[in-house]
Amino acid sequence: MTELKQTGTFRKWWKKLRDERARALVAARLNRLAYGLAGDAEPVGDGISELRIHYGPGYRVYYQQRGATIIVLLCGGDKGSQAKDIETAKRLAAEWKE
């Protein structure tokens, strides 16, 4: 199982996510990701990938794999905030320190 790490930005997004079904779906996808099963995920540049959850507004979680660690959870959002979220994820990945 791969170690998943979170940024503060992701934790804030997660705390604001009130839809219980959405939380369950995102949590299930992250669990599968930890076991190497990304499912519907696409690269968005700079080594960042977008995990797509087809529910509600189209939730997105951005992550980057570094060796045996996945820095998840750079940030999260939905289809409406996608462009801004991708830029935020790229910035957070560049700033990430172990």
Language model features with spans:
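Flexible, active-site-adjacent loop/turn segments at secondary-structure boundaries
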Residues: T2, K15, E42, D46
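A short, surface-exposed loop/turn module that caps and links secondary-structure elements
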Residues: A28-Y55
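Local sequence-structure signature of Cys/Sec-based thiol-disulfide redox active-site neighborhoods
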Residues: Q6
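Residue-level recognition of oxygen-bearing side chains
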Residues: T9
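Enriched for short, Lys/Arg-rich terminal
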Residues: E3, K12, E20-R23, A38, ...
